């Protein structure tokens, strides 16, 4: 994947976490990404150059190049093809389509597993470039994807996970992030893109006069969202970026965690927030209920309902921390990696 070792978003964190756990268990694991090598990794890492997606934010949307991520992935392929030696591997895995999937499935390649980190439409759509999708195994990150695809592909239902050794309850560290010491903090951890529905979050927080909305992330809508917040919640909005090592402290510094994506394939951020003992507020959707269980504050899709859920969640933070971290423990990466190991082994044996 192009983003490996360069950005720490959901899919990249998932692949690195799985690779680390599998390597720790004795498997030989190779990751190929565009970022620099990191000291102390338990897997083998090969760097293949790409052009950062931010350079493509103003480029046109075309078939095969539907957004800045598609352009970035295409720029990654020459380096990937140079680094990739099919004979050295028993199985390959990606969540990137089309370019990386096609490159890893070239003639003579080992069995290939596709993970629905970014959605399952490559697996079921017969339109445009999706008609050329293929894999020997499909890992579905939620039950909806699994039910839709299990008759067509060898499939497994395996969610994403969380490192419960790092993400755990603890004291707030607001000063570390330049956040106000007084008042309540609503945190979002999100790319600044349309599907994350940050404008809806801004409008909900506007109904909570003493709350500040903090959005950790980046993306093409950063300026547009800042301008909206200045009009709707002046003085009560922060945009920031934080390295992966600081994310547990950031979650602990919030009174509630808010995530309003309607079509996320999983949402690592839900289990990260719960593991830190921070109450979760989200839209009431089957996929969200499957992740948070009875521990989430789920609302219908109106600003008033979201604000009411935030109010309730922030009032229960201390009392709920134990139950939240207990729920998150069900998604520990060690257990998730065992499921990956079992499925990858079956794919190799049956292909």
Protein language model regions, located:
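Short hydrophobic beta-strand element within catalytic cores of glycosyltransferases
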Residues: 279-282
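Nucleotide-activated donor-binding/catalytic signature segment of Leloir-type glycosyltransferases, i.e.
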Residues: 226-242
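Short alpha-helical donor nucleotide-sugar binding micro-motif in glycosyltransferases
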Residues: 249-254
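Aromatic "clamp/platform" in nucleotide-sugar-dependent glycosyltransferases that forms part
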Residues: 243, 262
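Conserved acidic donor-binding segment of nucleotide-sugar-dependent glycosyltransferases
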Residues: 294-304, 311-317
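A charged, aromatic-enriched C-terminal amphipathic alpha-helix characteristic of glycosyltransferases
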Residues: 10, 318-347
